[in-house]
Every structure is written in structure tokens, then in C-alpha cells.
UniProtKB/Swiss-Prot annotation:
Entry protein name: Type 2 lactosamine alpha-2,3-sialyltransferase
Subcellular location: Golgi apparatus membrane
UniProt entry tagged with the keyword Aminoacyl-tRNA synthetase: no
Biological role: Transfers the sialyl residue from CMP-N-acetyl-beta-neuraminate to the terminal galactose residue on sugar chains of glycoproteins and glycolipids. It's alpha-2,3-sialyltransferase activity is specific toward type II glycan chains (Galbeta1-4GlcNAc) on glycoproteins and glycolipids such as neolactosides nLc4Cer and nLc6Cer, whose sialyl-products serve as precursors for the Lewis X antigen. Critically involved in the synthesis of functional selectin ligands needed for neutrophil recruitment during inflammation and lymphocyte homing to the lymph nodes.
Keywords recorded for this protein, A-Z: Glycoprotein, Glycosyltransferase, Golgi apparatus, Membrane, Signal-anchor, Transferase, Transmembrane, Transmembrane helix
Catalysed reaction, written as an equation: a neolactoside nLc4Cer(d18:1(4E)) + CMP-N-acetyl-beta-neuraminate = a neolactoside IV(3)-alpha-NeuAc-nLc4Cer(d18:1(4E)) + CMP + H(+); a beta-D-galactosyl-(1->4)-N-acetyl-beta-D-glucosaminyl derivative + CMP-N-acetyl-beta-neuraminate = an N-acetyl-alpha-neuraminyl-(2->3)-beta-D-galactosyl-(1->4)-N-acetyl-beta-D-glucosaminyl derivative + CMP + H(+); a neolactoside nLc6Cer(d18:1(4E)) + CMP-N-acetyl-beta-neuraminate = a neolactoside VI(3)-alpha-NeuNAc-nLc6Cer(d18:1(4E)) + CMP + H(+)
Matching InterPro entries: Glyco_trans_29, Glycosyltransferase_29, GT29-like_sf, Sialyl_trans
An MF annotation (GO) of this entry: N-acetyllactosaminide alpha-2,3-sialyltransferase activity
Domain of life: Eukaryota
Top enzyme class: transferase
Species: Pan troglodytes (Chimpanzee)
GO cellular component terms, A-Z: Golgi membrane
Membrane-traversing stretches: 5-25
Length: 331
């Protein structure tokens, strides 16, 4: 009898092992966060993109993965900078936040379209009454930012969103804005941003200290939708594209790239062709609308001490005139 029970036990163990291997091998079950790593790659193209000369590295995976983020940081130099452009003193914050996410994939595992044509949709008032929605929705990849709404503005900006960049102070908190097909990308500028994400994912009380305005107190997105942007992307925008100094004079506030420029930089790394919409500002009329939504005016942009809007406009003018990108809202 005892031998019979042992045989049954061993058979059960073997059956469990076989089923375990089959199910995990076919990705039926969720991948454990601590083992989270890249499962797909950017499809290469035979020809170089028009903007290739702007980048020092190509085919860079833009999202951090729990399995190798420290190795990637060392390889690309992010371990030599503090936030917002590195993780030298914040690696543990990154580790904790990444451990609660379910994926660091770039595209859906069944998406094998190479040479992607992308549009980066800014929030500029120039989009008002432009009726670009249908055209925007025709792109392979649509990148949006912050709390620029789609709902109620479909004719102007379209319906689809592939990626949306955000930070704690700019993310939607009303579930009406959640599109389950959108990947949300946290751009971390300070340790508080990572702590905020961790607290939300764990269901803890949110510590609102250290933010320039009150961050969202609830998360309308599922963990599978969230990614953390590699600081290398933001660093590239600041130092390689906008040529910001690494050290600002003591009497000046450090300048950082806007989310729009960061989104364009992201597009350079994952797309073969990049088009822009909503990146033109009317500085000649400070009463003109700042965004295609809401009532904010251009006077608000003039008061922003944390961004160098002049440098960004010169950069945009340069890449448009050189045909490195196509501007859908030129006029």
C-alpha cells in the first residue's frame, strides 16, 4: 500500500512539472515581475530613417525591465547620473516599482510590422479646428502625452493611442479616459515619482509631499499597461538634441525637456518615420490658446521656468526644415 501511494505521489509531481512547463512555455500565465524581461524587439528596416544622424545608438529598447535594468544602466551610462536623467542614487526606487509591473514589452507580441510610421501628437492649440483625427488614426503608432484628451476631441486628434507619456502630476485620474489598448509610460523626474507609482500599485496611502502640484490619488490603469521610460531617452533629449549644459549656473533653475520633446525622442528610437502634430506655438499672441483643450493661454508658457521653449522651438524648426520629420500642423 505504501509503495502504491509513493507511486501516485511521484506521478502527480511529474504531471505538475509537465503542465507547468507547457503552460509557462506558451505564456498562458502572467510572467512573474522579478523575471520580467524583454520578449520582443524592434523590427529592423533595410534603410536608415531620415533622423538617423541624430542618434548615437540605434534599436534601443526604451522601457526598463526588472531583470536587467541595472545592467542596461551600466551599459548606457545611466548609473553615472542622478534622476531625472539617470538612476545613480535611485536604483532601489526603480527596482521596487519595476517589481510590481507585469511587462516591459514594447509592442504586442503579435505585432511584427517593420519600419513603423509614427505620429507624435502634441497638445498645442494649433490643433483646434484642424480635423486631423482621421489622418492621425491611420498611423502605425500614435504617441500622446500627459492629460491631452481624446474623448470629445476625436475629430481634431483622433481616437487611438498607442503610447501616452505621463508623470504623477499630469496623469488622468478619471476612468472615462482609460483606453485598455494604450501603454502608459512613466517619465520619472524625481524619486517621489517612483514612490508614488509603487504606493498606487500596492494600494498604500499616497504621500503627496515633494510634488509641484497634487498628483493623482488613484490609478485608472492596470499594471500590464504601465512601463517606466529609461532615463537614457530623457538624457538624449536634453544633452544630444537640445544641447543643454550638464551643470547650470547657480542663479538659474535647471532646464528640462518638455514631455513633447521626450516623446519625439522616444519615437526616434522605435519608429522608422516620424510625423508631428500640435507642436506649433503662437508667441505673438499671448491670449491665444495654449492647448487644443481647456482655457489656458500662451501667457502660461511664457512663465514656465523649467523648460527652454526657445531651444525646443529651434530644434523643431531645424528637424522640420531638414525633412527629418514631417509637420502636419505647419500652417
Amino acid at each position: 500500500m505504501r509503495g502504491y501511494l509513493v507511486a501516485i505521489f511521484l506521478s502527480a509531481v511529474f504531471l505538475y512539472y509537465v503542465l507547468h512547463c507547457i503552460l509557462w512555455g506558451t505564456n498562458v500565465y502572467w510572467v512573474a515581475p522579478v523575471e520580467m524581461k524583454r520578449r520582443n524587439k524592434i523590427q529592423p528596416c533595410l534603410s536608415k530613417p531620415a533622423f538617423a544622424s541624430l542618434l548615437r545608438f540605434h534599436q534601443f529598447h526604451p522601457f526598463l525591465c526588472a531583470a536587467d535594468f541595472r545592467k542596461i544602466a551600466s551599459l548606457y551610462g545611466s548609473d553615472k547620473f542622478d534622476l531625472p536623467y539617470g538612476m545613480r542614487t535611485s536604483a532601489e526606487y526603480f527596482r521596487l516599482a519595476l517589481s510590481k509591473l507585469q511587462s516591459c514589452d514594447l509592442f504586442d507580441e503579435f505585432d511584427n510590422i517593420p519600419c513603423k510610421k509614427c505620429v507624435v501628437v502634441g497638445n498645442g492649440g494649433v490643433l483646434k479646428n484642424k480635423t486631423l483625427g482621421e489622418k492621425i488614426d491611420s498611423y502605425d503608432v500614435i504617441i500622446r502625452m500627459n492629460n491631452g484628451p481624446v474623448l470629445g476631441h476625436e475629430e481634431e486628434v483622433g481616437r487611438r493611442t498607442t503610447f501616452r507619456l505621463f508623470y504623477p502630476e499630469s496623469v488622468f485620474s478619471d476612468p472615462i479616459h482609460n483606453d485598455p489598448n494604450t501603454t502608459m509610460i512613466l517619465t520619472a523626474f524625481k524619486p517621489h515619482d517612483l514612490r508614488w507609482l509603487l504606493e498606487l500599485l500596492m494600494g498604500d496611502k499616497i504621500n503627496t509631499n515633494g510634488f509641484w502640484k497634487k498628483p493623482a490619488l488613484n490609478l485608472i490603469y492596470k499594471p500590464y499597461q504601465i512601463r517606466i521610460l529609461d532615463p537614457f531617452i530623457i538624457r538624449t533629449a536634453a544633452y544630444e538634441l537640445l544641447h543643454f549644459p550638464k551643470v547650470f549656473p547657480k542663479n538659474q533653475k535647471p532646464k528640462h525637456p518638455t514631455t513633447g520633446i521626450i516623446a519625439i525622442t522616444l519615437a526616434f528610437y522605435i519608429c522608422h518615420e516620424v510625423h508631428l502634430a500640435g507642436f506649433k506655438y503662437n508667441f505673438s499672441d499671448l491670449k491665444s490658446p495654449l492647448h487644443y483643450y481647456g482655457n489656458a493661454t500662451m501667457s502660461l508658457m511664457n512663465k514656465n521656468a523649467y523648460h527652454n521653449v526657445t531651444a525646443e522651438q529651434l530644434f523643431l524648426k531645424d528637424i522640420i526644415e531638414k525633412n527629418l520629420v514631417i509637420n502636419l500642423t505647419q500652417d
